[in-house]
Structures are given as C-alpha cells and as structure tokens.
C-alpha cells in the first residue's frame, strides 16, 4: 500500500553532514521525497512535536537537543513507507541498532540518534500537518 511518512534528520545529522547519505538510502529503496525543508525548531514547536514525552525524565534534554541546530524535515512516499522506513532507521538506541540501518551505521547516542520517522499512520498524519502546509507536498 502506497503511503506517506514523516522523517526528520536531527541537528546531529545536519552538523555531521549526513543529509545526502541518508536521503540516498531512501531513494535507493525506491521512495520518493515529496516534501522537504530545512528548519530550526523553537522551543514552542519542539514541545508540540514531543508532547507525548512531556514529564518524562529525558524530556528537557530532548527539547534542548532538538532546538540546538538546523534540521531537515521531509515527507517520504512509497509502498508501506511507515513500516519500511522504521526498519531502515533501526532501533532508537544506536547501541542496539543493527549494522546496515541508518542509526546502526551513523548514530552515536540517544537522543542524538540522527533521525526520527513516524511510527504509525496517525503519527505520520499529525507530524506532516505540524511541519508542512498542503501546498508544500508534491505528487510525482
């Protein structure tokens, strides 16, 4: 089933100049990038983005990290995009991520694990709407 998912390349990916290498993996897998932009999250937007983690012990560190530099946000489209992209990025903790996954190959620590991808259709819809207007998303 063709679907869209949200992907964010976190500040550490941008700082370490990994943008092209990561995007190339999605394109090599046959996915289309149908929307993409560079942003810098402010605290208010970061809190909206991570509202489900509010109150957790790692929340402040996560917010501080996500507002520390530029990010790339994008909408990736293709067959079973949500589940396939999640497999491609690997486990949240880079130490547990398989070699060959994006985190397994490039990430160093948590939350500095270079990438985020939506984990469900509902999350994808919420995150895409949070970062993109409809006219910023293109069909082929």
Swiss-Prot record:
PANTHER family: NUCLEOSIDE DIPHOSPHATE KINASE
A GO term, aspect molecular function: nucleoside diphosphate kinase activity
Reaction(s) catalysed by this chain's protein: a 2'-deoxyribonucleoside 5'-diphosphate + ATP = a 2'-deoxyribonucleoside 5'-triphosphate + ADP; a ribonucleoside 5'-diphosphate + ATP = a ribonucleoside 5'-triphosphate + ADP
Lineage: superkingdom: Archaea
Cofactor section: Mg(2+)
Keywords: ATP-binding, Cytoplasm, Kinase, Magnesium, Metal-binding, Nucleotide metabolism, Nucleotide-binding, Phosphoprotein, Transferase
Name of the protein this chain belongs to: Nucleoside diphosphate kinase
HAMAP family: NDP_kinase
Enzyme Commission number: 2.7.4.6
Assembly description: Homohexamer.
Naturally occurring in which organism (per UniProt): Methanocaldococcus jannaschii (strain ATCC 43067 / DSM 2661 / JAL-1 / JCM 10045 / NBRC 100440)
């Amino acid at each position: 089933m063709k679907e869209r998912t949200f992907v964010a390349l976190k500040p550490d990916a941008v700082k370490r100049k990994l943008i092209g290498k990561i995007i190339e993996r999605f394109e090599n897998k046959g996915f289309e990038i149908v929307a993409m932009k560079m942003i810098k999250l402010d605290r208010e937007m970061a809190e909206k983005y991570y509202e489900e983690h509010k109150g957790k012990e790692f929340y402040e560190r996560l917010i501080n990290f996500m507002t520390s530099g530029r990010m790339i946000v994008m909408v990736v489209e293709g067959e079973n995009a949500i589940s396939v992209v999640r497999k491609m990025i690997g486990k949240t903790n880079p130490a547990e991520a398989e070699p060959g996954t994006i985190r397994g190959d490039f990430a160093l620590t948590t939350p500095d694990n270079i990438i985020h991808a939506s984990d469900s259709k509902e999350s994808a819809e919420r995150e895409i709407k949070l970062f993109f207007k409809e006219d910023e998303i293109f069909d082929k």
